[in-house]
């Protein structure tokens, strides 16, 4: 009898231990985000098309606002809701603030030694602080007002000189405008760098939008050697560095008092002053210069291009905007930057374009630096994080008739593009939000107001406005696939 009691006692103890272990195991089990069925080796690559923001949006409708994809074996979190974006860029901003290492970005952007692609840390903080102080602060942006005035006036005059029956390529005009302004602000002179630099810039931006399978499936890295991508990256990277070397040599030869101090002068002065305490290598200066030039050129160009396309496609909206701008400019010689703040409808058009056609449909990739729980899902450290800005901006739960171009919606709401409202995030938010939004919008709004004030627009070749091709081109920054060709008729007094 005693032996039987001992047997039962031991059995109960063993059962209790087993139950506790099972309960502990269940409570510690991770809950990953929803994920589609993946294929061996390639993961979910087969589900991603050339316009990745559209592919992600389609998948999110099935798998939810937060989903886990695998590019090869690498985990990639795709966030497609305002709530998820808020977690990433506000509530848990610090652990989502770094950048992943991607080979094409490393080669062309100086291994993350600038601002945009730098890992989160002291270097990034120092570099960002310098860019803000010397180029992107409200005070500095205001100081470039003369440059914006001269360059926008030059664009208007160039369009005016074209014959009324001659088609104007607005896409080319906008590229030249943004190049001219940013070159003068960063480099001090419009011609510094030259046309060769502009061509290199276009190639770099195109390559940044390309995909390197070797980043995610290392043993398939040979594919980019076969298809020529590696060779093209190396060729363009070498040309870019040569151009940057030329710029630095030129500015180091400058005599004191030769010209007004600009961004490059400031960087070189900082390098000289810190050489004995905390030396700054040339690659850091090159990276900062290229960050500012590339970020300030392509995004503003894309925004102007989409704006004029939507306005031409929607003539009533164009007429409403023209009426406002022309009323403000009545009995004046033209539009100035001070006039822009008197134009609420123009401000609404600006916001609606950044909602409907954000230049960065997918915000720059982030990397999670520690394990996290977000919206009830467990996400491991090292996961690449993509915020689908395009999906958020067209979310029908946030926006009425989200596919419709309707600036009036912003006359009825306080939602803005400055990163405080997560319903639209054209410039991102939080620590890694774009520091150049003030610079970009100052040029965008002045150029737009002058264009609609000075000209009436229509399509050439008898094309109807409603048939205007609005197809997107694949790329790092989302442009129209075809250039915007119009007839511009000078306004009748």
From Swiss-Prot:
Membrane spanning residue stretches: 2-19
Catalytic activity line of the entry: (R)-pulegone + reduced [NADPH--hemoprotein reductase] + O2 = (R)-menthofuran + oxidized [NADPH--hemoprotein reductase] + 2 H2O + H(+)
Top EC category: oxidoreductase
Keywords noted in UniProt: Glycoprotein, Heme, Iron, Membrane, Metal-binding, Monooxygenase, Oxidoreductase, Signal-anchor, Transmembrane, Transmembrane helix
Cellular localization per UniProt: Membrane
One GO CC term, this protein: membrane
GO MF terms held by the record: (+)-menthofuran synthase activity; heme binding; iron ion binding
Obligatory cofactor(s): heme
Glycan attachment residues as annotated in the record: 169
This protein's record includes keyword Protein biosynthesis: no
Pathway stated in the Swiss-Prot or TrEMBL entry: Secondary metabolite biosynthesis; terpenoid biosynthesis
Lumenal topological intervals: 20-493
SUPFAM superfamilies, sorted: Cytochrome P450 (SSF48264)
Pfam families linked to this entry: p450
Residue positions binding heme: 434
Disrupted-gene phenotype: Co-suppression of menthofuran synthase leads to a decrease of pulegone level and an increase of piperitone and piperitenone levels due to an increased pulegone reductase activity.
GO biological process: terpenoid biosynthetic process; terpenoid metabolic process
Superkingdom of origin: Eukaryota
Membrane-side (Cytoplasmic) residue stretches: 1
CDD domains (UniProt xref): CYP71-like
Enzyme Commission no: 1.14.14.143
Membrane topology qualifier: Single-pass type II membrane protein
InterPro entries named among the record's database cross-references: Cyt_P450 (IPR001128), Cyt_P450_CS (IPR017972), Cyt_P450_E_grp-I (IPR002401), Cyt_P450_sf (IPR036396)
Family: Belongs to the cytochrome P450 family.
Function: Monoterpene synthase that catalyzes the formation of (+)-menthofuran from (+)-pulegone.
UniProt protein name: (+)-menthofuran synthase
Upper classification of the organism: Eukaryota, Viridiplantae, Streptophyta, Embryophyta, Tracheophyta
